[in-house]
């Protein structure tokens, strides 16, 4: 267990059985666990968690590590407390988020330094991303649906990384009235969450949050860490959604959350 660091949107709940790490019989066991789930979010969520919706580029005046030929669209970067540049250029957001969650006890600047390209943790994130993607392909071949295979592969990788995903995922739709409930959950002191962002254009992206002492930090592998007082998380999320909308032209439609226990 890892310690936490020192517009409205209804939810429909997806409850998943815990996934166990793969061994010689692990793929069959994992697939069996997946088949026990009563409802899949696949009708709502594209099967692209490993394909990040946005990769930072270089000319955005709000952020030297991101680019846009258009006007600055959001105040997102005024919330940033630690920058991460170019770490996600190859679309390894799931692996990078796993490594960030494993390193929460470190200082923010150390966490970011540990994830820069060429570092040991960045290399580890690349390996974890590949493990996740390979297992997802295997589970699809075994008959699992896109969403089931994605969730099982993700959680197997997280467990192999020494993390403890709850095995229960909740789905929240942008523009519906229950999104504040999600914000309340991810800002509960002492909690860590894995979040998947799904976009109307078909892309998806993985981020994470950690809450402690009335503050919540959001880690986005494309940009770094953003920290706000927990009662300001709505503003941060709105700014994040705006940043992906303009200049990246990715419109957030759905957020799924899973608590890391």
Swiss-Prot record:
Keywords: Hydrolase, Plasmid, Protease, Thiol protease. Its EC number is 3.4.22.-. Residues 1-15 have a biased composition (Polar residues). CDD domains: C58_YopT-like (cd20497). One of its GO terms (molecular function) is cysteine-type endopeptidase activity. Potential cysteine protease, which may play a central role after invasion of host cell. Disulfide bonds: none annotated. It holds the Pfam family Peptidase_C58. The keyword Signal does not apply. One of its GO terms (biological process) is proteolysis. The lineage of its organism: Bacteria, Pseudomonadati, Pseudomonadota, Alphaproteobacteria, Hyphomicrobiales. Belongs to the peptidase C58 family. This is Putative cysteine protease YopT-like y4zC. The active site is at residues 93, 205, 220. InterPro entries: Papain-like_cys_pep_sf, Peptidase_C58_Yopt. Residues 61-73 have a biased composition (Low complexity). Residues 1-48, 54-73 are annotated as: Disordered. It comes from the Bacteria.
């Amino acid at each position: 267990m890892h310690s936490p660091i020192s517009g409205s949107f209804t939810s429909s709940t997806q409850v998943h059985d815990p996934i166990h790490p793969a061994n010689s019989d692990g793929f069959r066991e994992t697939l069996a666990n997946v088949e026990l789930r009563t409802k899949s979010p696949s009708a709502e969520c594209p099967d692209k968690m490993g394909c990040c919706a946005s990769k930072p580029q270089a000319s955005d005046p709000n952020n030297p590590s991101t680019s846009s030929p258009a006007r600055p669209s959001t105040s997102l970067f005024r919330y940033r407390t630690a920058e991460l540049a170019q770490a996600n250029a190859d679309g390894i957001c799931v692996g990078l988020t796993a490594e960030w969650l494993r390193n929460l006890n470190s200082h923010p600047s150390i966490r970011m330094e540990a994830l820069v390209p060429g570092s040991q943790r960045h290399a580890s994130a690349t390996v974890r991303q590949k493990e996740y993607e390979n297992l997802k392909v295997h589970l699809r071949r075994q008959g699992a649906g896109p969403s089931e295979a994605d969730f099982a592969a993700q959680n197997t990788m997280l467990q192999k990384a020494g993390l403890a995903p709850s095995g229960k995922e909740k789905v929240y739709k942008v523009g519906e009235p229950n999104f504040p409930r999600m914000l309340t959950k991810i800002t509960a002191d002492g909690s860590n969450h894995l979040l998947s962002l799904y976009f109307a254009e078909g892309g998806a992206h993985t981020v994470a949050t950690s809450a402690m002492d009335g503050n919540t930090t959001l880690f986005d592998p494309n940009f770094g860490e953003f920290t706000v007082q927990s009662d300001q998380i709505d503003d941060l999320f709105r700014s994040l959604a705006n940043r992906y909308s303009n200049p990246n032209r990715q419109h957030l439609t759905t957020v799924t959350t899973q608590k890391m226990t």
